[in-house]
A protein has these predicted regions:
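Cytosolic juxtamembrane N-terminal segment immediately preceding the first transmembrane helix
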Residues: 1-24, 28, 35
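Extracellular/periplasmic helix-loop-helix junction of adjacent transmembrane segments
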Residues: 29-58
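MFS-fold secondary transporters
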Residues: 35, 85-90, 105, 179
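Helix-breaking motifs and short loop linkers at transmembrane-helix boundaries and internal kinks
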Residues: 38, 70, 88-97, 108, ...
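Central cavity-lining transmembrane alpha-helices of secondary-active solute carriers
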Residues: 48-64, 110-117
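Conserved MFS/SLC helix-loop-helix module at the cytosolic interface between two early adjacent transmembrane helices
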Residues: 57-96
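Cytoplasmic helix-loop-helix junction between adjacent transmembrane helices
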Residues: 105-137
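Hydrophobic transmembrane-helix bundles of small-molecule transporters
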Residues: 159-232
């Protein structure tokens, strides 16, 4: 209650920009990571697609997760999950582990971003005019992604690709600190909704289907499509 309403809006906007920096792996530094860990370019592309896959499968369940947890809990879960994924990515060398971490990081990225945008929606447009709201979200997504690319370019130029992961971890830790000290522990944006009835098996199967399709189209040319036993 002691946080001024105007400051609350800008804090949520800042949180949205922060979530655009996240992802356990960034395709902008693919050259460095391919050279250091001896991976294929397709391995890094696949990790980028897995991040998008994680964002996609979050959509059907993010409303239930939002109303299942308090707002502060949602931000903690998203930020801590991203921190763990980024920390593990710096040490693993197996492509399938990198893909899994990228997929999970994408899921948490979308969950945290949704937590930000759904909270300040009425601040942007009290009349719920989505013609006003979506351009603001578009600015956040595109602006955050653009700034992420610039930051990655400078950090990898003066250091190596792990600096970007450390930078993301630092941002998420600052985010957790602000959330801990400036948000109510028991605030929820709507009525409580349990996770009973959520088809988690279907979520897993759709995730496997998406990852399989992305793998086939990413590695198809490398393995010579249908003439390869690996594709079959």
């Amino acid at each position: 209650d002691w946080v001024p309403p105007r400051l609350r809006f800008w804090l949520y906007m800042a949180f949205g920009f922060l979530y655009q920096y996240v992802g356990s792996i960034n395709t902008s530094y693919s050259n460095q990571i391919v050279s250091e860990i001896a991976l294929l370019n397709e391995d890094i592309q696949m990790a980028g697609y897995c991040t998008l896959g994680g964002i996609t499968v979050c959509f059907p369940v993010m409303y239930r997760l939002k109303f299942y947890m308090y707002t502060r809990q949602l931000f903690f879960v998203s930020a801590i999950g991203i921190i763990i994924c980024n920390a593990l990515t710096m040490s693993v060398t197996e492509p399938w582990m990198i893909w899994g971490l990228a997929f999970i990081a994408g899921f948490y990225k979308m969950l945290g971003m949704f937590g930000c945008t759904s909270v300040f929606r009425l601040c942007v447009t009290p009349s719920r005019n989505y013609a006003v709201f979506f351009p603001v979200v578009y600015i956040m997504v595109c602006g955050g992604t653009y700034l992420s690319g610039i930051t990655t370019a400078y950090l990898t130029y003066y250091g190596n690709w792990r600096l970007m992961n450390l930078f993301v971890i630092a941002l998420m830790m600052i985010h957790c600190g602000i959330v801990y000290f400036m948000m109510k522990p028991d605030h929820r944006s709507g009525p409580f909704l349990s996770l009973k009835g959520v088809d988690f098996i279907g979520l897993f199967l759709w995730s496997a289907f998406l990852i399989s399709g992305m793998w086939m189209f990413t590695y198809g040319e490398h393995y010579d499509w249908w003439t390869s036993s690996t594709i079959w």
